[in-house]
């Protein structure tokens, strides 16, 4: 898969879709992405911890980030971002005067029980918070297991609207915006392109359904007409019936909401004369990232446009340099910044709470992102916390201003287009939505 484009989208994606990074307690945090054994890591003293964490001795952060599965290309940046965050926290004195411990784990995807197995391990090892998963569908398989244990779940990449109202005991948070925002941005872009009609083909799970519904609602509200609204099972590999329906519809635009299987969809569309190089305007989303690397002939993507929740990497060059040094320049950097910020916010909330208990930390998470003295690094923020000041952490992803549901009030999105011969997509514009 081509990673050059993902390197640009990396933090820019703003979508959709663990090589067991190992490290020790203390400031020595490793992130060897080459392991495939689940990434187990423990503190030097062998503390097993109690299920649900909260022993008050040290802040233990577990992760379920994708080394395997549909979104494995996101793993290196997310693991690397979490490791860099812990490195910075510990360099500034840690939390409770003690180094933060990070325990890396794999999330897999919904075709396996990897996430459930890893969550059980992380809880048994005393995790106070668990960062992940990247996939909304995977998070939904473990959210009750995590939050019922009194532990925080904090995703850097979940975008499904389902989480806004999920009964999570106030213990679920995310730095990625809801797809209610991306659906609005996508609909506006398709309308602004001059398309009066559109068809949607989407994977039938929380991410795909949520984003498709948001697009439909906003597209129709803007005066557009939806011709076909086609859901497919996540294990589908042939799309003959769906492509027949799309051809018959003859829509001005087609929106593809999927993961790696989007390659099969776009290939079939191209063979039937409705692909990106035809007169049909074809749009994708963050879940389609790296699509050119999945195709035998990436040139069929010329003109394919996509939206993605994004961080402007031009605003954070030092972090990008550090992240690439950590994971390699050829890896995607998507959601690396959001993962970094999720860890920093968790640590700051623990410091404000004076506790590593999940409920105590959760009570402070939203407020450390809003309403206080603005600070932009853990070192700067912890100095204010220690001085008794309220803080407003504006991280790599900018001002999050979490709403009470534990998610950003606003976000920026990148609009990009694939060029000639399937070259990596070029940035067209950033769009802000709230």
Describe the residue ranges of each PLM region:
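Extracytosolic ligand-binding ectodomains
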Residues: 2, 23-434
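Hydrophobic helical h-region of N-terminal Sec-dependent signal peptides
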Residues: 11-14
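C-terminal motif of bacterial Sec signal peptides marking the signal peptidase cleavage site
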Residues: 19-21
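Bacterial N-terminal signal peptides that target proteins for export
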Residues: 1-9
